[in-house]
């Protein structure tokens, strides 16, 4: 055991950047449709580790960096898959950033049958509600959504990836 680490502090460094990504895929099976959506979003060839919805304090919003293949990437994401031809599925993420930069931000993810505008509106409202429940003031809310109209098996995907500068 490392005696230099306090038991009340994590030995892991919190990520200091976040990136919003979204994509869609349509192919012959659900897993490949999901993988195609990751390719479209630019976050393929890494291992997504699903996290709950907290943005570390003072994290910077940046375009998705060049993450080494095979990396373990903390990610809050939503996705929706369907095999109903002609159906539209969507996924969206939002991030509420606090006015007080010592506080954490909130990441929300949502997916649904229907278009991306409604899904993005819903996920933005979820972020607003999360801040209201905490009694915090919002500086801004950012969001991103995708949609896929199914031809074979379709998938819509949206995510917030946390990484390091």
Swiss-Prot record:
Cofactor(s) listed in the protein's UniProt record: pyruvate
Gene: pdaD
Lineage: Archaea, Methanobacteriati, Methanobacteriota, Methanomada group, Methanococci
GO BP terms, alphabetized: arginine catabolic process
Coiled coil: none
Keywords: Decarboxylase, Lyase, Pyruvate
Protein name as annotated: Pyruvoyl-dependent arginine decarboxylase
Tree of life domain: Archaea
Residue(s) at site: Cleavage (non-hydrolytic): 52-53
Enzyme class of the recorded protein, top EC level: lyase
Record's cofactor remark: Binds 1 pyruvoyl group covalently per subunit.
Originating species: Methanococcus aeolicus (strain ATCC BAA-1280 / DSM 17508 / OCM 812 / Nankai-3)
Location of Pyruvic acid (Ser) modifications: 53
């Amino acid at each position: 055991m490392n005696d230099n680490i306090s038991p009340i502090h994590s030995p892991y460094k919190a990520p200091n950047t976040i990136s919003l990504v979204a994509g869609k895929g349509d192919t012959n099976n659900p897993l490949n449709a999901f993988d195609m959506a990751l390719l479209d979003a630019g976050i393929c060839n890494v291992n997504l580790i699903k996290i709950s919805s907290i943005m570390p304090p003072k994290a910077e919003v940046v375009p998705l960096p060049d993450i080494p293949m095979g990396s373990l990437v903390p990610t809050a994401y939503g996705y929706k898959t369907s095999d109903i031809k002609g159906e539209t599925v969507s996924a969206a993420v939002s991030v509420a950033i606090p006015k007080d930069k010592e506080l954490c931000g909130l990441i929300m993810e949502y997916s649904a049958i229907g278009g991306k505008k409604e899904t993005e509106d819903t996920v933005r409202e979820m972020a607003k509600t999360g801040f209201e429940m905490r009694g915090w003031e919002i500086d801004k809310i950012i969001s991103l959504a995708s949609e896929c109209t199914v031809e074979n098996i379709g998938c819509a995907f949206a995510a917030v990836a946390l990484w390091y500068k």
